Structure formats: structure tokens, C-alpha cells
């Protein structure tokens, strides 16, 4: 006997996942729940790994608005946070006993343990009773990503209704559900502490959330790692940040 289906949308609160939810509502597609996995930088201090402006918008604007439309939103977090992962010690090899340190381009354990693991645990609670259909935000103009959905339990409503990424953004704008991550036409999603982040993001964090940047500095020196983009040291990254801030100030004085 087949199990009943449960329809769950995986949502990052970016344009594609929000547009997916809106299309489901507009077209009476089955939608039982929405799940958002929040990466945590430090549970103890209550520091999220999400871009500060984005996570504030998620909790204060996006979730309340979706819930007012009848959408059930579940937030999950991993048992481990980024700080804990960085402090874990290697058990074997030449570096046994040393801390893992900051994530690197070679291995992003923050994604696997802080984001993916809690999502998998969330799905597991339904898997015995239901066949899970997962709505994912992949637009019709992303053919390679869509091809990977074949033969899985993942469904793209954006593709079903012929939505491109540009159309997904327009749908979010229609409902006034656009994350601050898209300000200025540039998407700035992902974790604020990511090794691969551009310098302007770090400048924004240091300027507006100095205790966040200090937390990264402390962790960098505590774990004795060099794990910024292209293997740059913290000193090299901060010199680039200082240079960018200097140039930004000079541009402002011209006007």
C-alpha cells in the first residue's frame, strides 16, 4: 500500500524559493510545509551565519507574511555551529590534534553539517508515514540543474510554469517579498563568514556588525588557520578591506 504524499518546499528566502511558494499558492498546488535551514555561526552568542540584514528580514517580514497567507514555515538549525566545527580536532594524519580551523575552498563543512544535516533530519521525521515531494527553486533557464532532478522526488514549479530567474524576481516584487540581499542589483546570499565572500561583504560586516567581524578574527587566531579566498591571510584581507573603504570614502567626497 502506497503512502500518502507530503509536499514540502525548501526555502532559503531567495527569489527562486519564494517564487516557488507563491506559484504554489496561486495555482492551488499542494503545499503542506516550508522548511528553512538557518546556518548558525555561534549558538551560545546567538549569532546567525546568515547575512544579518537577510536573517532580520526573514524573521520580521518574510515568515510573518507567508504565515498570514496560510503557509506553515518550519525553521531548523543544526546541533553544531560553525565555531564548534572550527574547534574540532583532527583525529588522524600529520595534523592530528590540531583544530579544523576556518573552512576552506577544499572543504566547506559548514554547509554539510550546519545546513544540510538539519534538513535531512527534518525530512526523516516524515519519511516513515509519507512519501515526500520536495519543491526546489530552480528556474527554467537553469537546464543543467533541472536535469539533475530527473528520477528524484524533487520538483521545480518554476520550470512547470515556465518561470525564468528574472520572472521569479518579478513575482517576488509583486508581493513585496524581496530580500535585502538583492539591494543594488547584486545578490549577496550565503554565509557572511564564507571564505569565498567578496571584500565588500566583509567591509559591510566590519562596519555594521563589528562584533561579528571580531568573532572571525578571534577564531582565526585561535585556530591558527589561513583560509580566506586564494589562501590569503587575515592581514591581507583586512588590507584589501581598508583599501576599499578608503576608495569608497573618496568617492563620496567627490559628490
Regions found by a protein language model. Give the residues of each.
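Nucleotide-activated chemistry modules centered on ATP-dependent adenylation/adenylyltransferase
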Residues: 1-255
Amino acid at each position: 500500500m502506497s503512502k500518502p504524499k507530503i509536499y514540502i518546499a525548501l526555502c532559503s528566502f531567495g527569489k527562486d524559493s519564494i517564487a516557488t511558494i507563491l506559484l504554489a499558492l496561486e495555482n492551488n498546488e499542494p503545499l503542506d510545509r516550508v522548511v528553512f535551514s538557518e546556518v548558525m555561526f555561534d549558538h551560545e552568542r546567538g549569532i546567525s551565519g546568515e547575512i544579518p540584514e537577510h536573517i532580520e528580514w526573514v524573521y520580521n517580514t518574510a515568515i510573518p507574511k507567508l504565515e498570514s497567507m496560510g503557509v506553515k514555515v518550519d525553521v531548523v538549525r543544526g546541533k553544531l555551529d560553525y565555531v564548534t566545527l572550527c574547534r574540532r580536532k583532527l583525529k588522524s594524519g600529520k595534523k592530528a590534534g590540531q583544530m579544523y580551523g576556518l573552512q576552506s575552498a577544499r572543504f566547506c563543512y559548514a554547509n554539510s553539517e550546519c545546513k544540510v544535516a538539519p534538513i535531512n533530519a527534518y525530512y526523516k521525521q516524515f519519511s516513515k508515514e509519507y512519501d515526500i515531494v520536495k519543491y526546489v527553486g530552480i528556474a527554467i533557464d537553469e537546464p543543467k540543474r533541472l536535469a539533475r532532478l530527473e528520477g528524484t522526488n524533487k520538483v521545480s514549479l518554476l520550470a512547470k510554469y515556465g518561470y525564468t530567474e528574472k520572472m521569479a524576481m518579478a513575482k517576488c516584487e509583486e508581493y513585496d517579498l524581496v530580500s535585502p540581499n538583492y539591494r543594488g542589483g547584486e545578490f549577496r546570499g550565503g554565509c557572511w563568514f564564507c571564505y569565498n565572500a567578496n571584500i565588500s561583504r566583509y567591509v559591510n560586516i566590519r562596519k555594521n556588525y563589528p562584533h561579528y567581524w571580531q568573532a572571525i578574527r578571534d577564531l582565526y587566531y585561535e585556530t591558527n588557520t589561513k583560509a580566506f579566498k586564494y589562501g590569503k591571510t587575515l592581514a591581507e584581507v583586512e588590507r584589501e578591506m581598508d583599501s576599499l573603504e578608503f576608495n569608497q570614502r573618496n568617492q563620496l567626497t567627490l559628490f
